[in-house]
Amino acid sequence: MRQYRRINNLMGWFTFLIAAVVYCMTVEPTASFWDCPEFITTGYKLEVGHPPGAPFFMLTANLFSQFASDPSEVAYMVNIMSALLSAGCIMFLFWSITHLTRKLVCPGVEKMTTGQLVTIMGAGLVGALAYTFSDTFWFSAVEGEVYAYSSLFTAVVFWLILKWEDCADQPHSDRWLVLIAYLTGLSIGVHLLNLLCLSAIVLVYYYKKNPNANVKGSLLALAGSMVLIAVVLYGVVPGIVKVGGWFELLFVNTFGMPFNSGLIVYIVFLLAVLVWAIYESYNYASARRANIAFLLTIALLGIPFFGHGVKSIVFGIVFLALVGACLWGVFGKRLMVSPRTLNTSILCLTMMVIGYSSYAVIVIRSSANPPMDQNSPEDIFTLGDYLGREQYGDTPRFYGPAYNSKVALKIEGQYCVPVSEEGAPVYQRKEKESPDEKDSYEIVRHKTEYKYAQNMLFPRMYSSANEHIAAYEQWFGGYRNEKGEWVNGVKGRLIPYDECGNPVMVKMPTTWENLKFFFSYQVNFMYWRYFLWNFAGRQNDIQGNGEPEHGNWISGIPLIDNLLYGDQSKLPDELKANKGHNVFYCLPLLLGILGLLWQAFRGQRGIQQFWVVFFLFFMTGLAIVLYLNQTPLQPRERDYAYA
């Protein structure tokens, strides 16, 4: 086994070397299109980019920019950073593949045959190098964007849970989980995509702790992973800012202290409670004190306080009461938490907060008013809006309006006004009228949420922008006739609508039309097309909006391609010779399918691996499609989001 580890390590570094050489030789020499110049600038001069920011990317890019001989080389050095980080991703992918393959080829065997060794190394090389030269990943690897860094974090944390799996029965195995939590916190400062691999991580943990796992247990583990993602995404990330804002208002507006005094007290208090909670849960001299410390920790992190206002506080109190009931065994000993689990949970939360603290860079640099200071997140309240991406608005995902929905109206006196709900207050620093006036925050407005008269489940066609409405119609065969009038493609259904006493009919898409758009555009065109670019082939690099000659996936097999898009031999020469054109004849796709089938039919361990890999793909692919709810006419191809 020692010889296997040596060979495995050497082959991993060999794949890193191949990827690093290829990416560095093909790296973008200057700044690419879209966000790359912005990210390079934020790294070089530590300026503040668009929400929600990428502070840890900024710090790393700044380090690499120091190696530039003059300012003209800065972009090149940041691009080299992406190339090396992507090569690191390939290396950890290799080690993950060999780990999974070894578990199925020779489980529990200390000494393996030469054939088994070649099989394991071959699987790792083929899988890692196939990803190395895939269209989307290669493109992201050679430019100064956050997705190369995000891919590395995903690869590392998945590899770490496999390392934990190898030593899970040892006394200090939890250190791998703590390291995963720290890297997860750091990854928030690069991109939130890394959180999506938590489902696969939880499944690996569950299957290791329950070798004879059943379907029910697997589903419960998946549900738990979704809760874990929600705790980080909707709890820790906005919660720290929210509770910090409460402290700031208390100390500034109530106690009359200077700006940021409440935030400083909050940070010191939070650190003290985290240290106390770690101490109590480690020594466990008093279960009562340990439980109180844990409850105080999750309260200070803002995890239970979903929403805003009184409802947020009530929900938080109920949440804390339920967690406390579990800790004290009110619901039975089965739901009680062991001292080791409690201590590990607190350590993981602490390390995640330490990693997440990279966002302090955003506030510090914004306070210096650099040339690029988007949204100016100089205090805890503007930071909250910055993290919440408030400028982009809300996207309905599970229930909400369609593109033709009308705002609900009501009569107030002699006027017809829209129905709305007052949201969270927006605070800003009050301008002083005299030097002696104390610092304070004032409410400048409340976030307003308008109510719609017509709503539907799982709304996929929701944007009321004129160009999007036209695109929805076109995806259902709509067109302009000779008179310039739209012939609608969406048949829809008519719903009565009371416009303050004036009855009108509103056309709403049917549930079937809504689902048809979801599968035909969002799933097929905006995901499977990108997926097959990398596993089958790509027609060209011209952005497509459904045309048969632009940006489609192809296989390289004329029978299939001509059936899908027409005779490809009749395309103009400039499209045939497009540099983005490549064909793999579906070989990577077939290899992937064969690998999944081989896993699925290798007994219980194989089927468990199958579900781990499946949900890693699902959460970093189709789950993003569900969450983004993309509109047609995207400004650029979005394949980078799924790499």
Give the predicted meaning of each segment.
Residues M1-V22, G88, T113-L125, A321-I354, ...:
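Start-transfer (signal-anchor) and selected internal transmembrane alpha helices
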Residues R5-F33, Y131-F133, H191, V231-Y234, ...:
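Transmembrane signal-anchor helices characteristic of membrane glycosylation enzymes that use polyprenol
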Residues G12-I18, H99, K103-F139, A148-W159, ...:
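Membrane-embedded helix bundles of polyisoprenyl
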Residues W13, I80-M112, V156-L160, L590-W598:
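Transmembrane-helix motifs of polytopic, lipid-linked glycan transferases
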Residues C24, P71-A75, N79, L104-I120, ...:
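Aromatic- and kink-enriched transmembrane "portal" helix at the membrane-lumen/periplasm boundary
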Residues V27-F39, G49-A61, Y76, M372-N375, ...:
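Extracytoplasmic catalytic/substrate-binding loops of multi-pass membrane glycan-assembly enzymes
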Residues M112-V118, V157-W176, L203-N214, V275-S286:
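Membrane-interface transmembrane helices that cradle and orient dolichyl/undecaprenyl
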Residues V118-L125, C167-G185, N214-V227, A287-I298:
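Short hydrophobic alpha-helices at membrane interfaces in multi-pass membrane enzymes
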